[in-house]
A protein has these predicted regions:
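Conserved CoA-thioester-binding segment of acyl-CoA-metabolizing enzymes
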Residues: 1-57, 92
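Well-ordered beta-strand positions
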Residues: 122, 161, 165-167, 173, ...
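Hydrophobic, secondary-structure "cap" segments at the distal end of domains
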Residues: 147-157
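Glycine- (often His-adjacent) and acidic-residue-rich active-site loop
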Residues: 56-93, 109, 139, 222
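C-terminal long alpha-helix characteristic of the crotonase
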Residues: 22, 124-129, 180-228, 241, ...
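Terminal low-complexity tails and localization/encapsulation signals of metabolic enzymes
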Residues: 1-3, 248-261
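Glycine-rich beta-to-alpha active-site loop
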Residues: 90-138, 142, 168
Length: 261
């Protein structure tokens, strides 16, 4: 695949994947998500890379769905369901990577961007970083099988603050909650992530990979069984009048009026 929206740099034991739509705050369209999934799957056959650092070009890690995207909407629900599985596949591809994954996180990690960040093994954040799940603000649920990742990371009550509240949670709070492993100045975040990468790249790779898989299996044993319907819930919510009102209000920069329909 020829990448349009990401860059993949392979240089020995540490690789870097950069979300590369800085003019859109690295927002996600369908092609962008496909590229991230493809890159993650591509590391299955990489016998050299032991750690992969994910970061964003420009000021932001990843700002989530590009609501201005002109991605075509297929008239058949069956096809729309298939297309929307790309987000789940992308997150699962990241979770299944043998390599240790580290997010070098500046600015926003919103929606799908927050899902990607929570799928990483470690998160190094800049002081200006923040997380939010704005799906609730456009009348839909969080999908991509990522709700369990948020709950595992910050606990049930704080997950509800994030996912139901829809507010921006700043870096210092994320650090206190355990969503960040370390916080540094923005101009040092990539180098700090690389410092972590060098440490984990120096560990015995077979043992590191087995331990990672075991920890993920233990912590996420029920995740797929309880979240297999999240994209169908999304379709149900997305077809409501409230969801249409939320998107219109966002694009028109006005407060929404929700009716429960």
């Amino acid at each position: 695949m020829d990448y349009q929206h990401i860059k993949v740099e392979r240089g020995g034991e540490i690789a870097i994947v950069t979300f590369n739509r800085p003019d859109k705050a690295n927002a996600l369209n369908h092609r962008h998500i496909e590229e991230i999934e493809h890159a993650a799957l591509g590391f299955r056959d990489d016998e050299t890379a032991r750690v992969v650092v994910f970061t964003g070009a420009g000021k932001h890690f990843n700002s989530g769905a590009d609501l201005t995207s002109d991605d075509p909407q297929h008239p058949l629900l069956m096809v729309r369901r298939q297309r929307r599985r790309i987000g789940q596949r992308c997150i699962q591809a990241i979770l299944d990577m043998d390599q240790i994954t580290i997010a070098a996180w500046k600015g926003a990690a919103m929606g799908g961007g927050a899902c990607i960040a929570t799928a990483m093994d470690f998160r190094i954040g800049a002081r200006d970083c923040f997380m939010s799940y704005p799906e609730i603000l456009i009348g839909v649920n969080l999908m991509w099988q990522s709700l369990p990742l948020c709950v595992h990371l910050v606990g049930p009550a704080r997950a509800k603050q994030l996912v139901i509240g829809g507010k921006h949670v700043p870096g210092p709070t994320l650090l206190a909650w355990g969503a960040l492993d370390e916080m540094v100045e923005a101009d040092a975040v990539v180098e700090k992530a690389m410092e972590w990468a060098r440490h984990y790249a120096a560990q015995p790779p077979v043992a590191a990979q087995m331990i990672k898989r075991s920890v993920n299996a233990i912590s996420g044993a029920l995740d797929r069984s309880v979240m297999h319907m999240d994209f169908d819930q999304h379709h149900l919510a997305a077809d409501t009048s409230d969801a249409a009102e939320a998107v219109s209000a966002y694009l028109e920069k006005r407060p929404p009026t929700f009716t429960g329909n």
